[in-house]
Amino acid sequence: MTGKNLIWSLPIDGTHEVAASAASLSFVGGAGDFDEEGQIRNPDDLKCQLTGAVENIEAAFRQENCGLVDVIRIKAFVTLSEQVCEVSVVEMLLAALPNRPAPVISIVPVVMQPFASQKIQLQAIAKRGWRDEVHCVEECELKIASVDAQGSPVVTTALRAGEVIATANRTAAHCVETYDGGLDGAAQSHVIMGSLNASLRAVGASLQDAVKLEGYYQGTTREQWTPLAKARASYFAEPGPPATVIPCHLGEQDQTMTRVGVLAMRERRNSYDKYIPREDAWPERVWDWPAELPYRQAQKLRNMIWLGGQVPAQPFSNTGKRVHPGQLLPQACFTMSYISDLLRPFGRDPSDLKLLVCYYRSLPECAETEALVQLLTDCCGGVLPPLTLIPVEHMQDTDSTIEIWGVAQG
């Protein structure tokens, strides 16, 4: 067999899936420009790595009987620079993707990547055959206030493929043409949430249909987190969706403090759009937030289980205090126990995960990624599902080192 026919691999020991499916959706976790031995083919070359990562998404999805044409969302964790801005990355992705309308593209600027010489990793969600079925899109020119980019590519800001809906994540600078950095974090959050709701309404849904909220913000303390959290939460009635919000480098280019996107599901019954009821699990042991929020920890619908971001918070409480403060591996093990707790009421366990997303604090003097991956492998029964690893400089506070969420087969 020639090297061209060999499936790529992450540069980790042990067995892992490059793609997997839960009900109607298929997932690729963290595709990079890897060869079959886990080596980066184009070290430190963002453009070539992006092309290679897209090719690897297509190769991975082939085992699930789908391809790039079936992708509904690509999420790019990318190291930006003065030479390469967010608009440039979107343009490169649009050029690498074969069909129109394009899938939703969400960008997350990051300082670090999990593996040496890596500049980008791509997470992808696909729904087989959606282009041949009823679908609906919202498109607009991509303009980011204060970002000096030539041209304005047309992007998909919301895509509804049957019951599944993806929205592009966004900042206040995406939503307000005259944005100049003058809004505080809570005000930026209100602008973003209003824009997301408008995008969802354009395809027949609303924020209440969300199955997953994913957000990022600048901050290192609970005092910085709280006003943004309350602003986002004000757009949901209880029960809200599972949520994950991470302190993350956003890039200085657009002077923003937060970025949010959602995934949603809504059914079409006869001629009406209808909310899809969820099954819910929240065992008493599983922590609650130190602010009163409407989000849930685990919801099942259409044979998929969506998890909220799990953290090593004190069990049986809403204190916000952390177990094993500052210790990555003990906190990772403890956090995975919450994922087990949440899947158990549905008759599932971590081996049923089809996507695993892990944000973790990575310190320069501590090369813990390899040990973390081994721990996650053990917790998932010896075979990792498609995995997105995102190292960050800090988590919610100095005691926190990790947040993990995923999607499981229901």
Language model segments and positions:
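N-terminal presequence-like segments and the immediate start of the first folded domain
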Residues: 1-72, 78-354, 360-410
